[in-house]
Amino acid sequence: MKVKELGHIVLYVSDLARSRRFYGETLGWREITPGEGIGFSAAAFSSGRTHHELLLIEVRGAAALPRGRRLGLYHFGLKIGETDDELREARDELAAAGVRIVGATDHGVTHSLYIEDPGGNEIELYIDVQPARWKEDPGVMFSDPVARPLRL
């Protein structure tokens, strides 16, 4: 067996309406949920790459994620463009929507902004920097692992 690509992410959420607004309106992800008749309270989103990349399932009354370092998912990354100008535009749109940026990092291979969704899941919004460099040598990502503050 060989994994070909990461297909989708499924998140449990406590408030589907709030999470649906965040991923659909704030992040601009296209919702593809058929509406009624799926048997449970959920919303699916796709960028058009595949049938769905994100599925939100409402689980009311579940415990919130613990804050800080913990086992399990740290964050997931969403590529939002190709240039720092697009990253700046995203930063400004997030600020206008009242979304707090919790980090901004130059990883060498990416420039990244970090935010949290309404349920506390961390999301990396990024652009690739010199994609040919890491495509030719994936190990370059770890050759200089120092994360630097990103100044946009």
Which residue ranges define each predicted feature?
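Vicinal oxygen chelate
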Residues: 5-14, 65-152
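Loop/turn position at the start of each blade in beta-propeller repeats
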Residues: 4, 40, 108-110
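Catalytic cores of nucleotide-enabled group-transfer and carboxylate-activating enzymes in metabolic
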Residues: 18, 22-25, 32-34, 56, ...
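N-terminal beta-strand motif that seeds the catalytic metal site of vicinal oxygen chelate
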Residues: 1-17, 76, 132-152
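Residues embedded in well-ordered beta-strands within globular domains across many folds
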Residues: 7-10, 55, 77, 105, ...
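Core segments of cupin and vicinal oxygen chelate
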Residues: 12-54, 58
